[in-house]
Amino acid sequence: MKKIALLAFAVLVFASMSFAKTITGTVSDAHCGAKHATPSDAAAHCVEHCVSGGSTYVLVSNGKVYQLDSQDKFKGLGGKSVTVKGSVKGDSITVASVAEKTS
């Protein structure tokens, strides 16, 4: 009986890790990271410049920098506040959707 209970608990823990989560933050780049935690025109210009130079988009939320798997979904969103839905594992997000946050 204990083995069944332990197995059921393990299944619940792993299942909860794969559910989609919603995170709001600012799109930055891997080079600058949390330097662009606040949305601005200057941040947008810098992020897009760094990405065009080979850096990748990241999401900064509550001081944490998340790596993003779907880079093409973030084109034109550098330096802007967004809401990302996806699966979070450590500091990486498997992105299901992204939308620019208004106000």
How would you describe each model-predicted region?
Residues 21-103:
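Mature soluble domains of exported/periplasmic/lumenal proteins and thiol-rich metal-chelating peptides
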Residues 2-19:
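Classic N-terminal secretory signal peptides
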